[in-house]
Amino acid sequence: MPRRREVPKRDILPDPKFGNVDVAKFVNVLMLSGKKSVAENIIYGAFEHIQTKSGKDPLEVFTAAILNCKPLVEVKSRRVGGANYQVPVEVRPVRRMALSMRWLREAANKRSEKSMPQRLAGELLEAAESRGGAMKKRDEVHRMAEANKAFSHFRF
C-alpha cells in the first residue's frame, strides 16, 4: 500500500466549441507532441464531415460511437504456480472510456481515406452503427474474456 496520500483526479475543462468534457478528453487522446490545436482541428473537421455526410448531430454520433466501443470485460495475465493464465476481469468505468477512445483513434489511423478528419468521421459513423475497426477490437477483447471464462476464479 502506498504511504502517501491519494492524488486527486484532475478535472478536464470542456472543449470550447461544444462544451463537452468527452470531446475535450478525445482531443487529448488524439493530440501528438502537445499540438492541441491540431487535434482540435482534426476533431472539428471530422464533426463537419459527419454533419455533411449523414446529416446527423455530430455530438450524438460521437457519444453513440464511444458508448458502443466501451468494453465490459478484458483479460489480464495472472501467474499461478508457474503458469500464466488470462483471467477475465471487469473494466472500470474510467478505463472503459479510455480504451474506447484509444481504439477509435487507432482504427481511424488504419483507415484508407485521405485526411485524418475524413478517417475519423468514417470510423465514428461506423462505430455509432456498431461496425468498424474499433468495434472489431472490442468484440475481440470480449471473445478473449469469454474463451478464458474458466479462469475467472483466479480473481485479482
Curated annotation (Swiss-Prot):
Record-given protein name: Small ribosomal subunit protein uS7
Family to which this protein belongs: Belongs to the universal ribosomal protein uS7 family.
Keywords (A to Z) from UniProt: Ribonucleoprotein, Ribosomal protein, RNA-binding, rRNA-binding, tRNA-binding
Organism: Herminiimonas arsenicoxydans
Any one Gene Ontology BP term: translation
Function statement: One of the primary rRNA binding proteins, it binds directly to 16S rRNA where it nucleates assembly of the head domain of the 30S subunit. Is located at the subunit interface close to the decoding center, probably blocks exit of the E-site tRNA.
Lineage, opening ranks: Bacteria, Pseudomonadati, Pseudomonadota, Betaproteobacteria, Burkholderiales
Key word Ribosomal protein present: yes
One matching Pfam family: Ribosomal_S7
GO molecular function, one term: tRNA binding
Subunit structure of this chain's protein: Part of the 30S ribosomal subunit. Contacts proteins S9 and S11.
GO cellular component: small ribosomal subunit
